[in-house]
């Protein structure tokens, strides 16, 4: 697989022309690709984590401390969604992803991920994915029929690297990204689902054609292994799954997910441990699947959307990644001649947690932490 290191100096970073803070304010942002975007501030949240659009153009936003918001088609808060799970926010854990399948109009079903504490030992935690029925009202809505479809196992100490991003494939399988919980070796252990990409039937049962189904137990859930902290996933127009993950100290990755493959962590990485201990690069062990793209320095990827709209016609099929430490929106040309590569970077000045594409063709960005803004991106007009 073709891959490349992408090193961009601060001098090449994108610039914004104005500062803004109030809802309704807009600014023009110019990327390293010289494309100008108009970014409009639609709404503000407290530690937002994920966003999903409903078929009618309304949207849902999760906040890490446990609130789920319903937004109108203009991105304004209509009210809260009640009936969600009880949340204890700690470290990187709390309320996580929310996903609206394409058959929502027929089923009313959504998926939610969050972190739960162990009932007997509060120091232990793990991610959970539940399905639920969502009923919408004029000023919010409610969740009912909550059903656990997946549990991260085992629960371990620490409050990081949960992953817990959710997607449903075009052929109707449930995919979940699971981080290795900052424990390194579980990513290679087939008796845990830590550090894996998981494939399930929509009800949480095991597909009979999963690659390790004959192993039984937890291994039967596993689609791929050797992942660190995968915080973004999406399917392209051909149904191919792509997942990005944070590397250790540098070496963030965008991976083309191939059934049963091992992506190498912690045996290989294009980054090194924070302790300074070196990790062999991917090229030293070709037995492992190498990333399509890796980043040195790190971008700290979070949120991922492959653009399928028409407003940005030249960007159809491109991937958009939010950057936490890089405080930037990164565009990846997924169809570049030599393989996927970074094609543009929009300096943001704030950590980006989530990126989504709307039915209106706009790109939506959620900033991280308290006061995180929801921003709508459209082509800038001269």
State the predicted function of each range.
Residues 1-21:
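Gram-negative bacterial Sec-dependent N-terminal signal peptides
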Residues 227, 338-359:
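Conserved blade-ending motifs and adjacent loop-strand segments that build the rim/top face
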Residues 126-138, 190-203, 257-258:
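Beta-propeller blade signature
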Residues 40-41, 77-85, 140-151, 204-212, ...:
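Beta-propeller fold detector
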Residues 218-253, 258:
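Repeat-solenoid scaffold signature
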């Amino acid at each position: 697989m073709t891959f490349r290191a992408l090193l961009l100096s601060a001098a090449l970073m994108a610039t914004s022309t104005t500062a803004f803070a109030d809802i309704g304010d807009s600014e023009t942002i110019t990327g390293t690709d010289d494309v100008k975007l108009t970014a409009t501030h639609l709404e503000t949240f407290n530690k937002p984590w994920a966003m999903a659009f409903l078929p009618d153009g309304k949207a849902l936003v999760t906040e890490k401390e446990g609130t789920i918001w319903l937004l109108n088609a203009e991105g304004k808060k209509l009210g809260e969604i009640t009936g969600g799970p009880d949340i204890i926010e700690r470290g990187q854990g709390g309320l996580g992803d929310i996903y609206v399948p394409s058959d929502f109009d027929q089923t009313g079903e959504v998926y939610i991920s969050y972190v739960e504490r162990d009932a007997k030992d509060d120091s232990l935690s793990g991610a959970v994915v539940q399905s639920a029925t969502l009923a919408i009202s004029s000023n919010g809505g409610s969740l009912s029929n909550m059903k656990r479809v997946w549990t991260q196992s085992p629960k371990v100490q620490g409050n990081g690297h949960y992953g817990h991003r959710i997607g449903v494939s075009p052929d109707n399988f449930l995919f979940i990204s699971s981080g290795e919980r900052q424990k390194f070796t579980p990513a290679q252990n087939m008796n845990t689902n830590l550090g894996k990409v998981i494939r399930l039937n929509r009800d949480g049962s095991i597909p009979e054609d999963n690659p390790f189904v004959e192993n039984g137990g937890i291994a039967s859930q596993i689609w791929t292994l050797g992942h660190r902290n995968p915080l973004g996933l999406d399917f392209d127009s051909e149904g191919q799954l792509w997942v990005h993950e944070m590397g250790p100290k540098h070496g963030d990755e965008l991976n083309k997910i191939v059934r049963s493959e091992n992506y190498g962590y912690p045996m290989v990485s294009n980054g090194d441990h924070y302790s300074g201990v070196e990790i062999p690069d991917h090229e030293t062990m070709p037995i492992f699947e190498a990333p399509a793209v890796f980043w040195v320095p790190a971008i700290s990827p979070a949120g991922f959307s492959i653009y399928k709209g028409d407003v940005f016609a030249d960007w159809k099929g491109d991937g958009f990644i939010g950057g936490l430490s890089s405080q930037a929106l990164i565009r990846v040309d997924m169809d570049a001649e030599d393989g996927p590569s970074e094609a543009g970077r929009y300096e943001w000045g704030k950590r980006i947690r989530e990126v989504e594409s709307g039915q209106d063709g706009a790109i939506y960005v959620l900033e991280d932490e308290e006061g995180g803004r929801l921003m709508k991106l459209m082509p800038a007009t001269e």
